[in-house]
Amino acid sequence: MRKLGRSTTIRCIVLGVLVLAATSCSQKHSSVAEQIAKTYGLDSFGQIDAIRYTFNLQFPGLNVSRSWVWEPKTGQVSYEGKDKDGKPVKATYVRSQLSSQSDAVKNDIDPGFINDNYWLLFPFHAYWDTSANVQDKGKQELPLGNGSAELVSVKYPSDVGYAPGDTWDLYVGKDNRIEQFVYHRGGPKKPSVVIATWEGYKKAGPLLISTDHRGTADGGPLRLFFSDVAVKLTGSDTWMNAQ
């Protein structure tokens, strides 16, 4: 695994906003995003006390693996990974107290958490992030392979978050599951365009999770997948593994 800072150009390709699950009373949720999020378990998300997962990225010359436990109700994040020398690194922090954390947490670990969490739970974030502009653009041809699907575009403001102006083009099937997506970076950093599948669907408790994404980043082969996915429900100490 490379040092977090050196892998920024790949692992921070989806940092659209800074605050997880934040909503604004002055802005309305997208009905299109809500319909998709409900397919992934939105109505049951309040039952989730903790989510555990390992983010794995394979790209030419780069292999990254990061493990997380996120407690949505408290905002606590626990991280396990390695530094540039391959030595284990662990950190636990509360996101509402991020300003009091070390530079390593603020500049490397938390941006990595946001990135990985968005990959895992983007159908929810597209609904939670009321600053995003969500548009249904009708049926379009899939970017990979044959067939067509409903194109739902999620564009973030140009002045918000780690990577402002990012756009996620979601190709949604009749069952409201995302089949593929095209990511367009709003800023100058690479990669500029990521095209990937949404596959390997599993249920983790009440949540539906896509655990495997295969495609390209600026034309180079990319695989991003999740392992050790599990959830812990309110009132239980037992992890429910995705299957």
List PLM regions with ranges.
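Flexible, processing/modification-adjacent segments and terminal tails
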Residues: 27-31, 96-166, 186-189, 242-243
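Intrinsically disordered terminal and processing segments
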Residues: 30-33, 39-43, 72, 86-90, ...
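Gly/Pro-enriched, hydrophobic low-complexity segments
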Residues: 146-241
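Tryptophan-centric aromatic hotspots in well-structured domains and transmembrane helices
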Residues: 45, 70-72, 119-120, 168, ...
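Bacterial N-terminal signal peptides that target proteins for export
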Residues: 2-13
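C-terminal motif of bacterial Sec signal peptides marking the signal peptidase cleavage site
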Residues: 21-24
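Hydrophobic helical h-region of N-terminal Sec-dependent signal peptides
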Residues: 14-19
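N-terminal mature ectodomain segment of secretory-pathway/periplasmic proteins
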Residues: 30-107, 136-139
